[in-house]
Regions:
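Flexible C-terminal active-site loop/helix
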Residues: 1-15, 24-48, 333-405
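Shared catalytic-loop signature of beta/alpha-barrel
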Residues: 45-47, 244, 250, 261-377
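Short Gly/Pro-enriched turn/cap motifs at secondary-structure boundaries
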Residues: 54-58, 185, 361
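Hydrophobic faces of well-ordered beta-strands that scaffold small-molecule active sites
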Residues: 76-78, 162-164, 189-193, 224-230, ...
Length: 405
């Protein structure tokens, strides 16, 4: 089997009536690393895979999918690609490497792609390699007629505990209370709340954050785990100060309190903060993770198969985490892939899996087989492949992205 073409397919659809709340980029309030610059304080990050409201009351969704074709009429499909630069990198650097190659030679191809990006070993260049690697796994799984988890060695967990990521939810206390009760009633035993305040908002913002978590704890009761996502926007002093106030409501984890490159700060917080620290969502490859692990930087590490190097590298990362006797939880840009990868490890390595309640729904809009937790647990798909095939009935228009765009 040989690779015959590599292309990016742009899909557009109209969601007439979303089933629930949407992630609205114009309304979402969240903390951001750029908040320390006053002129950027209100310019939050745009999430490209989400619904865009239209004047007629409908919602437009535009996603980019990577398609790798073979001479065996088997396609590798993965998406949506969540950032603008990976398609350019795929077309410019990776497609010439891939054409004519055997998709079964995944480790060889990964090594060639990695060695070809010495000036882009992290960030969106590595995301491009990650999407390619996922598509190659899709080809091999389909050729074998097996779902991804079986190609990776089979289930260790038959189902995986899910936590609800509430990114995009309103921040007023009544909405927080209502959301907490709703998620607990849906069977979630763990909730992560993204926050809107950091050092730039001072003590007043800190007070509001503490009030939010008191409200959330009151809504869900004592038995639901509560986590906090600081989105790389705090500093060491702020984290230590607010953690002392949050421990009264039993917050069990603070995710990404500081910028990803501040590994020594992560290690200091992991050793001295009264609440455990998680991170790694914005780290890349086994070498990046080894540096974190050598510093004992986190209690829980969060690699993303769509970002950190693909399925191949993410597996190596989690194996490395397990060798250090630490915990992993996949950052779930691709929920189907995340569930396949989570279930092949015991709970002593991967105890829980993320589901982005709003972004996850939008990102799976075009999929034939979206993956969602039921009653608080994920179950991996049984269809051959990684589960990214497109439901053409949802596609209103489709074009192949030009190689020079």
């Amino acid at each position: 089997m040989k690779i015959t073409d590599v292309k990016i397919r742009t899909l557009t659809g109209i969601d007439q009536q979303p089933s629930g709340m949407i992630y609205d980029n114009k309304k979402v309030i969240r903390v951001a690393p750029t908040d320390i610059h006053p002129e950027y304080r209100k310019k939050k990050g745009h999430i490209s895979v989400t619904h865009v409201p239209q004047e007629d009351g409908t919602f437009k969704i535009t996603h980019h999918f990577l398609i790798i074709e073979t001479d065996a009429n088997i396609e590798g499909v993965v998406g949506p690609i969540s950032n603008p630069m990976p398609p350019l990198y795929i077309y410019t650097y990776l497609k010439p490497i891939l054409l004519g190659q055997d998709p079964w030679d995944s480790d060889r191809l990964w090594d060639i792609m990695y060695r070809s990006c010495v000036n882009g070993r992290k960030g969106e260049n590595m995301q491009a390699i990650s999407y390619v690697d996922c598509a190659l796994w899709d080809i091999r799984c389909k050729a074998a007629g097996l779902p991804l988890y079986k190609m990776l060695g089979g289930k260790v967990q038959t189902r995986i505990r899910a936590y609800a990521n509430t990114a995009g939810y309103p921040q007023d206390l009544e909405s927080v209370r209502s959301a907490g009760k709703d998620l607990a009633e849906k069977g979630f035993t763990a909730i992560k709340w993204g926050i809107a305040y950091g050092p730039a908002q001072g003590d007043a913002g800190m007070k509001k954050t503490v009030e939010i978590f008191r409200t959330l704890r009151d809504a869900v009761g004592p038995d639901v785990s509560i986590m906090l996502d600081a989105w790389s926007s705090w500093d060491v002093r702020y984290t230590l100060k607010i953690a002392e106030q949050l421990k009264e409501v039993d917050v069990c984890l603070i995710e990404e309190p500081v910028l990803a490159d501040l590994q020594d700060s992560y290690a200091y917080l992991n050793a001295h903060c009264c609440i455990p620290i998680s991170g790694g969502e914005h780290e890349y490859t086994r070498w990046g993770y080894k540096s974190l692990l050598d510093k004992d930087a986190c209690a829980l590490y969060q690699p993303d198969p769509a970002w950190s190097g693909g399925i191949s590298e993410c597996r190596r990362i989690i194996d490395l985490i397990s060798a250090y006797d630490r915990l992993a939880s996949i950052h779930n840009s691709l929920p189907g892939v995340g569930t396949h990868m989570s279930c092949i490890y015991p709970t002593s390595v991967v105890p829980i899996e993320e589901y982005l309640m709003l972004v996850g729904e939008a990102s799976q809009y075009f999929l034939k087989t979206p993956v969602r937790p039921e009653n608080g647990f994920f179950t991996p798909l049984e269809v051959p492949g990684i589960g990214m095939d497109i439901d053409e009935s949802k596609v209103d228009s489709s074009v192949i992205m030009p190689e020079q765009y």
